[in-house]
């Protein structure tokens, strides 16, 4: 993004060319994509060739978004997810393995707590910082409370900016 300012980079930074001369990213609403041969599609599914197979895996609209986020953050790559829970699941499953633990605040979104419960069969444990009582809520969010729970097995320290007291 060095050659553009932030706003110009948003519009033109990836220098993508769009089909039929579109000036902005087209929104691809197709669930599947046509290929010249079954062998061609097989190479895409086997990650031996770049391309699109099924929109839940990736599509040109999402790919364009990921390229722009990467450019704006001066990163090496990005992954767009359909929801916050999908993003958390993706991050956790890429960081954690059996025997690891998460140190977490108590006042979390219910979906996050359910995700943590779903990780238990994979040998991943969660330690909550304090009991989930209103009077404990303020104390649980102090850094010292988290530090006291961290062990050699801790791979993630997790809190949400808007918790559920």
Model regions and ranges:
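Short acidic loop-to-helix transition motifs that present clustered carboxylates
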Residues: 85-88, 130-135, 141-143
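A glycine-rich helix N-cap at a beta->alpha junction
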Residues: 118-130
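Short helix-loop-beta connector
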Residues: 72-76, 96-99, 152
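Short conserved active-site loop signatures built around small residues
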Residues: 1-28
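Conserved N-terminal alpha-helix of the aminotransferase class I/II PLP-enzyme fold
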Residues: 32, 37-86, 111-119
């Amino acid at each position: 993004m060095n050659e553009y300012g932030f706003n110009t980079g948003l519009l033109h930074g990836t220098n993508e060319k769009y089909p039929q001369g579109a000036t902005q990213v087209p929104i691809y609403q197709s669930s599947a994509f046509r290929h010249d041969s079954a062998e061609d599609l097989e190479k895409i599914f086997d990650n031996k060739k770049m391309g699109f197979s099924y929109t839940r895996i990736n599509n040109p609209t999402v790919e364009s978004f990921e390229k722009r986020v990467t450019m704006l953050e001066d990163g090496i790559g990005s992954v767009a997810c359909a929801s916050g829970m999908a993003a958390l699941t993706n991050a956790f499953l890429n960081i954690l393995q059996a025997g690891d633990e998460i140190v977490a605040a108590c006042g979390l979104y219910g979906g996050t707590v359910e995700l943590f419960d779903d990780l238990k069969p994979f040998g991943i444990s969660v330690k909550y910082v304090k009991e989930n009582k209103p009077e404990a809520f303020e104390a649980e969010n102090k850094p010292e409370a988290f530090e006291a729970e961290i062990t050699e097995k801790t791979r993630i320290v997790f809190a949400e900016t808007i918790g559920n007291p």
